[in-house]
Design a protein with these regions (language model features):
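Gly/Gly-Pro-rich "capping" loops immediately C-terminal to redox-active cysteine motifs
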Residues: 33-34, 38-40, 44, 60-88, ...
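Conserved Rossmann-like nucleotide-binding pocket used by diverse enzymes
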Residues: 18, 47, 69
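Cys/His-rich metal-chelating microdomains
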Residues: 25, 57-58
């Protein structure tokens, strides 16, 4: 009994000492902690009003839609034109299991441009590209 307690205590100490070392170097969470630059705040407001219900606050996704702060949506894979088409026409589900995205009513191409700039900033801040 004394031996197994000693072994358990040693294992506990090792796990406490090793856990922090293992977590070093892991990529940061996809959430962005920086303050949104003034020139992107309109895009942020439009994103919150038109996109965040499905794509989450700061684009991290929800149970209803995928995260836009994700490697799949980097500019080389989903360029800005893809975001414009998605807003104007909707998108058939092809990367995720959330279902089809409907077109977004009442959003102009200029609105989407501002949203894109905000999303690209979020992606860059999170290290997506």
């Amino acid at each position: 009994m004394k031996f197994s307690r000693s072994v358990g205590f040693v294992l506990l100490l090792l796990s406490v000492g090793v856990a922090p070392a293992c977590s070093q170097g892991e990529p940061p969470a996809t959430q962005v902690s920086s303050a949104v630059p003034a020139d992107l705040q309109t895009g942020e407001a439009k994103f919150k009003a038109n996109c965040s219900a499905c794509h989450g606050v700061a684009g991290i996704g929800t149970s209803h839609g995928p995260p836009l702060v994700h490697k799949i949506y980097e500019p080389n894979h989903h360029g800005d034109a893809a975001f414009q088409r998605a807003a104007a026409n909707g998108v058939k589900a092809h990367h995720w299991e959330f279902g089809n995205m409907p077109k977004i009513e009442g959003v102009t191409p200029d609105d989407v441009d501002q949203i894109i700039k905000y999303v690209r900033w979020l992606q860059h801040e999170a290290g997506v590209f």
